[in-house]
Regions:
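Cleavable N-terminal signal peptides of Sec/SRP-targeted secreted and luminal proteins
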Residues: 2-18
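Cleaved targeting-peptide boundary
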Residues: 16-26
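C-terminal helix/juxtamembrane-tail motif
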Residues: 16, 131-145
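Terminal recognition/anchoring or ligand-binding modules at protein termini
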Residues: 107-136
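General zinc-binding finger modules coordinated by cysteine/histidine
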Residues: 61, 66-85, 94
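Glycine-aliphatic tripeptides that mark coil-to-beta-strand junctions in extracellular
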Residues: 41-45, 61-65, 96-100, 116-120
């Protein structure tokens, strides 16, 4: 299993199909399965760190916009605009770097029941909302669930 890189691979496959991420809940579930590295049914903060480490090309513990979007564009150029929008969401303190503070904040948003782990349902809810929010960057103007 390859953390968020698997997301990109999955979305890349979707892009060959016209980049229709619908049904969003199915896309989100595929992403969850790929990111639940130990397959225990929960996504943890440690798994988030592992997921984002693939983008950290200089291995300094922070992910710049350039690192993130370059990785996405290399693997899935059709997601260029979406990658910038997601980076803006992830960079919670707007300091142009994704670091521990941003990872913790993003994790807390996803962990709606505050049990220090993200269930498949919490993951699905987060990503379906993201896909709908940014549908104009990847979809065909029709919300799906």
């Amino acid at each position: 299993m390859k953390h968020l890189a698997a997301i990109i691979a999955f979305i890349c496959w979707q892009s060959c199909q016209g980049l229709d991420l619908r049904p969003y809940n199915v896309t989100a579930l595929g992403m969850f399965i790929s990111n639940d590295l130990n397959q225990d049914g929960f996504f943890t903060l440690d798994e988030m760190h592992s997921s984002f480490s693939v983008y950290d090309s200089d291995h300094d513990g922070r992910v710049t916009r350039h690192e993130y979007t370059s990785y996405v564009n290399l693997h899935t150029p059709t997601l260029h605009d979406l990658s910038h929008a997601l980076y803006d969401d992830y960079d919670m303190d707007h300091d142009h770097h994704l670091d521990e503070h941003d990872f913790q904040n993003l994790f807390n948003i996803m962990d709606t029941d505050k049990d220090h782990r993200v269930s498949a349902l919490e993951w699905e809810q987060y990503w379906v909302n993201q896909f709908v929010k940014y549908e104009h960057l990847h979809g065909h103007g029709h919300a799906g669930g």
